[in-house]
Each structure stands twice: as C-alpha cells, then as structure tokens.
C-alpha cells in the first residue's frame, strides 16, 4: 500500500502511463522518494544556476520559466500548467538550471529525485518513451515561441499562447489576462484588446479569470499566418 505522503501526488504518479507498468516495490519506492515544493504567486520556486535535483511536475497552479540575458533583460518563454512535467533536459544532463521557475499563482511542485530518474531511464522502456515524447513536445513549443516572438503581431502571439500545442489539457483555460500577458510578453491592456477581438471573431469566449477556446484550428491558422515583424 502506498504511503499517504500526499494524495494528489500519489494520484498524479498513478496516472502516468510509465508508472503503471513498474513493479509494486518500485512504485512504492517512487512515491516515498518524491518531494513537494509549495509557493505563492511571485515566488521563485527554483532558481537559475542551481544544480538540478530531479525531474519536476506542476501538481497544481501555474509557473513560468524565465531566463535572464547577460544584460539583465528577463524573458518569460513558457508557462507550465498543473499536470505537466518540465526540466527533463536539465535532469538528463545533470547541469545547472538555466532559468528561474516562478509561480504565477499558488503552486505546488513535485520532484522526482535524480537517483530515481536515472534508475528509471536505465530500466524502463515506457519511461524512456515518455521522455522522448516530452522532449519532442518541448522542441515543437520552443520553435513556435521563437518564431512567434520574433516575427508575429500581438494578436498572433496571443493566439499562439492559447493554442493546443502549448496547452494540452481542457479547453477552458484558467488563465488571467495578466498571466497571459506575462507569457506572451505583452501588456495587460494589449492582451485585453486582443482577446476582445478574438472573441468577436468567434475564436474564444471570455469569463472572469478564464478563456474558453471555441476554435482551436482558427487560433492555429491565425498564429501561423504571415505577419508583420513584432516591435522590439
């Protein structure tokens, strides 16, 4: 029987496809070995430059991955919602973290320790398949973000950050305009104007603190259409 360190953490692990195929003793060892990290909005949960301690997942909440240039310019380039893993590349290379992980709302992280991460990579085909899928997804996201931030209009940036290639869960996103602006690199006022325009076009509907996606393909078409170069 699994130890009750955290019912959400146990349920989260049991929902992972690679976890189900492990022997019971390995499952129990993993559940006992994970650690939890909590933070409020604005907290830096994990710091750039620290040695990576494991593979992380967002149990609840929302975080942004934020890098800082040598000139001190900060850039938030990806949001990670509840239910998703992140940091697999750094865990595989066992390097210093290249970005800060900052809570955009009250958040809880789960950490699978490096020792267990290595053990699973060495022994579990299903775990390695999950890692490959995760890395492929992140590569696609990174390429889309780079292209959009360099070449696209504010409307296309917002459409991209609402797209299914960045959010794989429910199509009712519990995402505030402030959070969306942080991720897209736009002011809250600009995001508000853009969302109103998308709503008028029938691509989204807006509720308090939530954006409902009505037309995934329409958002994708908008995000990938030829656009003007974004302002620096």
Show the residue positions of the predicted features:
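Cyclic nucleotide-binding regulatory domains
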Residues: 18, 43-105
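Phosphate-/nucleic-acid-contacting segments
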Residues: 154, 162-232
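Cyclic-nucleotide recognition modules
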Residues: 78-133, 140
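Polybasic "coupling" helices that flank or enter modular domains
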Residues: 104-105, 122-188
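Cyclic nucleotide-binding regulatory module and flanking cytosolic helices
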Residues: 1-41, 86, 90-91
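Short loop/turn motifs at secondary-structure junctions and domain boundaries
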Residues: 28-29, 45-49, 195
